[in-house]
């Protein structure tokens, strides 16, 4: 009885919007996460620009964004769907060695990038959505060393990033095909866990 009441309450909140026009709670399978940067890709998967997604405060902070819920990472490598921190999405993280950091601000994290890349290529390869295909092309061509050659800002290191298509401007994880694919992933996860 309590669970049914909580489910009804959640449904009511999900149907209501806050003062910014966003749902009061994220839809099932989504979570509000701090996303600091948005990488804008063209249809060919080329990186066009990196747009900061930060608050206008004195000390800017990443803004909250509704994204597919994050994986639980107690141990092992588990990429998130269509967003992640730079170690996964770009294969680079901040250099922890302070003495070297001035000259080499980032280090390569190829294992996490390879997992992110393979996870997405496996999931997205059969989609005909231009946003999902742009991300596939980006991941096929991206190398962690490109972080320096693309002149991406060091402030981006270790931040969560999401992807957007250049024209029409749209966050890739909010595209209809991405939402359908994510819903299918959630159903298969529930079936594996015996929740279906």
Model-derived features with residue positions:
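Conserved phosphate-interacting/catalytic interface
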Residues: 1-196
């Amino acid at each position: 009885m309590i669970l049914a009441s909580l489910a009804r309450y959640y449904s009511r909140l999900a149907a209501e919007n806050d003062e910014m026009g966003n749902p009061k709670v994220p839809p099932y399978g989504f979570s509000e996460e701090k996303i600091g940067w948005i990488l804008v890709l063209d249809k060919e998967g080329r990186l066009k620009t990196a747009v900061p997604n930060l608050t206008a405060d004195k000390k800017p902070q990443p803004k909250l964004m509704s994204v597919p819920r994050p994986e639980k990472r107690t141990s092992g490598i588990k990429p998130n769907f269509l967003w992640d921190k730079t170690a996964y999405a770009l294969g680079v993280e901040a250099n922890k060695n302070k003495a070297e950091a001035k000259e080499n601000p980032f280090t390569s994290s190829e294992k996490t990038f390879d997992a992110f890349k393979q996870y997405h290529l496996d999931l997205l390869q059969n989609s005909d959505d231009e946003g999902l295909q742009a991300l596939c092309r980006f991941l096929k061509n991206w190398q962690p060393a490109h972080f320096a050659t693309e002149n991406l800002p060091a402030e981006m290191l270790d931040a969560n990033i999401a992807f957007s298509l250049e024209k029409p401007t749209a966050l890739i994880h909010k595209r209809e095909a991405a939402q359908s694919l994510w819903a299918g992933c959630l159903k298969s996860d529930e079936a594996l866990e015996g929740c279906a």
